[in-house]
């Protein structure tokens, strides 16, 4: 595993997989948008089939644009077509599970992922979601929504997953990375 910063670095390290974790891209939107070299390299990696996984803030970075609370809009990677918009209230919080509706980078159709969501933003996608998500308590479904988007070899969602809870997620991701070699 090689660390890199989409904010500070100008070049992607040589890799077959990219993991863009959570964070607060809205606090660095201008800098992320201004790093044209990194955005260009990330798009080129996607075109080559590099397996890209992004969660929460990573989803916002892979989107087309990010609108911060002041109303300013910044261009992002445009790998997952859609628009992120920051709000002032918590949009979703807590543990949930999601069932893949089609093949994704981390799951085959029908497989379940468990994770946690915590975000103040909304993502308005240009393509259909690939996960059916739900929040349950005491065996009762409290909420249901659609989430997660797949674009070629890239998958992004608000869901923060833990690979140890379902090791097959990592197996799916590794298989996708091998296809890009």
Q: Where in this protein do the model-derived segments appear?
A:
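Glycine-rich, charged/polar anion/phosphate-binding loops
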Residues: 2-8, 62-64, 99-103, 141-144
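Structured core elements
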Residues: 1-3, 19, 54, 61, ...
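Acidic, glycine-rich loop-and-beta core segments that form the ion-binding/anion-interacting portion
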Residues: 1-42
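Cysteine-nucleophile active-site neighborhood
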Residues: 25-105
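Generic hydrophobic alpha-helical scaffold/packing signal
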Residues: 16-19, 29, 39-46, 63, ...
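Solvent-exposed alpha-helices and their adjacent loops that cap or buttress functional pockets
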Residues: 10-12, 44, 53, 106-110, ...
């Amino acid at each position: 595993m090689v660390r890199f910063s989409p904010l500070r670095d100008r070049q992607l390290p040589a890799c077959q997989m990219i993991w863009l974790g959570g964070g607060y891209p809205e606090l660095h939107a201008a800098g992320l948008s201004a790093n044209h070299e990194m955005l260009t390299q990330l798009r080129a990696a996607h075109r080559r089939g590099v397996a890209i996984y992004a969660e929460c803030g990573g989803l916002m970075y892979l989107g087309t644009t990010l609108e911060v609370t002041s109303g300013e809009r910044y261009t992002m990677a445009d790998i997952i077509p859609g628009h992120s918009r920051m709000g002032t209230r918590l949009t979703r919080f807590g543990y949930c599970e999601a069932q893949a509706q089609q093949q994704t980078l981390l799951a085959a159709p029908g497989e379940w992922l468990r994770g946690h969501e915590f975000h103040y933003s909304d993502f308005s996608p240009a393509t259909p979601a690939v996960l059916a998500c739900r929040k349950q308590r005491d065996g009762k479904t409290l909420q249901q929504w659609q989430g997660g988007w797949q674009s070629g070899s890239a998958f992004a969602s608000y869901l923060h997953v833990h690979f140890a809870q379902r090791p097959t997620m990592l197996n799916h991701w590794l298989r996708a990375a091998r296809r890009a070699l």
